[in-house]
Amino acid sequence: MSEAIIAKKAEQVELIAEKMKAAASIVVVDSRGLTVDQDTVLRRSLRESGVEFKVIKNSILTRAAEKAGLDELKDVFVGPSAVAFSNEDVIAPAKVINDFTKTADALEIKGGAIEGAVSSKEEIQALATLPNRQGMLSMLLSVLQAPVRNVAYAVKAVAENKEGAA
């Protein structure tokens, strides 16, 4: 191999390693068997969710995972691999891909990483069932408001009882 090709591959490894380090979550999939239309729909859905999706050679992914400190992740780089990176929303890639697997049998989740920790296929699928950030915040808000609401109802009931007795 020429030195130019080796330098280009080393640059790719560095770039992918940086993406892996910066990513809030990474999902590795086997997209073999997807039709062009399905692939286009998947990529559009991921892009709309702020997720970057790339098909990358396993040799480059393996070296990048080693550089990023995700050595255990290289076990999933067998067969054709595509990787979804999300820098902001931890749940987005898992949710979009898991939802898409329900309509496209050819897409298979292989594994991934969540906030720098290697995760199994099952953990990625469990992550996909969680609500997104907005959903979690609204759930937290309703839990925090419940005690205040109960106190307000109790005060109102006491006030009504005193008015009725007077």
Swiss-Prot record:
<keyword id="KW-0689">Ribosomal protein</keyword>
<comment type="similarity">
    <text>Belongs to the universal ribosomal protein uL10 family.</text>
</comment>
<keyword id="KW-0699">rRNA-binding</keyword>
<dbReference type="GO" id="GO:0003735">
    <property type="term" value="F:structural constituent of ribosome"/>
</dbReference>
<dbReference type="GO" id="GO:0006412">
    <property type="term" value="P:translation"/>
</dbReference>
<dbReference type="GO" id="GO:0015934">
    <property type="term" value="C:large ribosomal subunit"/>
</dbReference>
<dbReference type="GO" id="GO:0070180">
    <property type="term" value="F:large ribosomal subunit rRNA binding"/>
</dbReference>
<comment type="subunit">
    <text>Part of the ribosomal stalk of the 50S ribosomal subunit. The N-terminus interacts with L11 and the large rRNA to form the base of the stalk. The C-terminus forms an elongated spine to which L12 dimers bind in a sequential fashion forming a multimeric L10(L12)X complex.</text>
</comment>
<dbReference type="InterPro" id="IPR001790">
    <property type="entry name" value="Ribosomal_uL10"/>
</dbReference>
<dbReference type="InterPro" id="IPR022973">
    <property type="entry name" value="Ribosomal_uL10_bac"/>
</dbReference>
<dbReference type="Pfam" id="PF00466">
    <property type="entry name" value="Ribosomal_L10"/>
</dbReference>
<dbReference type="InterPro" id="IPR043141">
    <property type="entry name" value="Ribosomal_uL10-like_sf"/>
</dbReference>
<comment type="function">
    <text>Forms part of the ribosomal stalk, playing a central role in the interaction of the ribosome with GTP-bound translation factors.</text>
</comment>
<dbReference type="InterPro" id="IPR002363">
    <property type="entry name" value="Ribosomal_uL10_CS_bac"/>
</dbReference>
<dbReference type="InterPro" id="IPR047865">
    <property type="entry name" value="Ribosomal_uL10_bac_type"/>
</dbReference>
<keyword id="KW-0687">Ribonucleoprotein</keyword>
<protein>
    <recommendedName>
        <fullName>Large ribosomal subunit protein uL10</fullName>
    </recommendedName>
</protein>
<keyword id="KW-0694">RNA-binding</keyword>
